[in-house]
Curated annotation (Swiss-Prot):
Entry annotated with the keyword Translocase: no
Entry-linked Pfam families: Ribosomal_L14 (PF00238)
Protein name as annotated: Large ribosomal subunit protein uL14
CDD domains tied to this protein: Ribosomal_uL14
CC per GO annotation: cytosolic large ribosomal subunit
GO MF, one example: large ribosomal subunit rRNA binding
Organism the protein comes from: Methanopyrus kandleri (strain AV19 / DSM 6324 / JCM 9639 / NBRC 100938)
Gene: rpl14
Keywords: Ribonucleoprotein, Ribosomal protein, RNA-binding, rRNA-binding
Amino acid sequence: MKAIKAKSPHAALPVGARLVCADNTGARELQIIAVKGYKGVRRRLPNAGIGDMVVCSVKEGTPDMRKEVVNAVIVRQRKEYRRPDGTRVKFEDNAAVIVTPDGAPRGSEIRGPVAKEAAERWPRIGSIASIIV
């Protein structure tokens, strides 16, 4: 895992946000229940942005995946963020990829585009991504 190069708004996805699962593990919808490494302020909901690892509950998917608690990395977010060259990037949906605790993807393919920041921070996600934006 490497440092992220863009100013990602970490207020994009608070705890409780629902995400599309962008891989082929059998999960379809995830809900954020915690953000790994978040050091916050009292009574403030932990927030996550692109490239952050989150702990999620599988809300929709195959019967063996449902109700499972998994680690995931956020690869797309609807809230726009700014890159160092001045461009602003935003996606159509909020999406994550289910990973193992050390950051290896559990699925073998990723549907849809992946943000460049997430692919740089998690090289194993970048290696199986079909489109990197």
